[in-house]
Amino acid sequence: VILDVVYNHTAEGNHMGPTIAFRGIDNGAYYRLVEGDEAQYMDYTGTGNSLNVRHPHSLQLIMDSLRYWVTEMRVDGFRFDLAATLARELDDVDKLATFFDLVQQDPIVSQVKLIAEPWDIGHDGYQVGNFPPIWSEWNGKYRDTVRDFWRGEPATLGEFASRLTGSSDLYADNDRRPTASINFITAHDGFTLRDLVSYNDKHNEANGEDNRDGESFNRSWNCGEEGPTDNDEIRKLRRRQVRNFLTTLLLSQGTPMLSHGDEFGRTQDGNNNVYCQDNELSWMDWSMLEEEKSAAMLGFTKRVLSIRNHHPVFRRKRFLAGGPLGSD
């Protein structure tokens, strides 16, 4: 069990928001405030506030929480939302941040799986490949490269090969292994895999923000028509593209992360920001498995997973190393 934890902000929002968590206890200790205008919050998270990880109280809160989940609830590890925010000592992301030291020195937390979402929206917030050796990372470069390759984007072949073989350019220099790369194509944010091959544009009208919310550049390709279609050739092409993505993901070096429902074709009708939708749009519809095409896609996914599990060549412990061929 990997627990998704969000220690980078609270529900207060910006300075105009309600007092829900720590604002009424010690605003300056728990939140990053704008220097010289302490009524305002620094916002590295896109939520209106950022937790003050420079203060001992905030750090103690985080570490106590992590230890509790390991010792009492027996989780196997954590995925840290917007983890770059937790490493901001002054303004920049600091590889020597106190948070990293505390995690690495902790006899309990350091022994479980630690997975970073290695970015935030602040200055220089994209930190893929820069986390300490005991961490694994969501590999955003893998996602972007694989999406570009399968939509026919030129000049991606070389980088595609790097991502397929574990992204040694990102992780080998500090003695990390291929498993440090959490390979993914889709996640809870963004398109589902089926929507990735069915829509060129987001369709978030149901969110009530006039389709302004959510990522606009999705590196998607609808295979010829936007959204649902009765064209059998386009539907076949879309299913083939899904199989291309699944095979690439599950046979790449590194740790594959498959978003739930992608294995049988779950759709969000082109909505790539369903955090606010507690309805059929975001729910899992298990009855889809009664459909022939969905059951076939699940069967395909199982077969590819079986190939990965039965052949260690797809689960190397070390990066590939090139060398000259023998003359004989």
Residue ranges with predicted function:
Residues 58-69, 99, 238-249, 253, ...:
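Alpha-helical packing segments of well-folded alpha/beta enzyme cores
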Residues 74, 95-260, 264-265, 273-277, ...:
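Conserved alpha/beta catalytic core and glycan-binding cleft of carbohydrate-active enzymes
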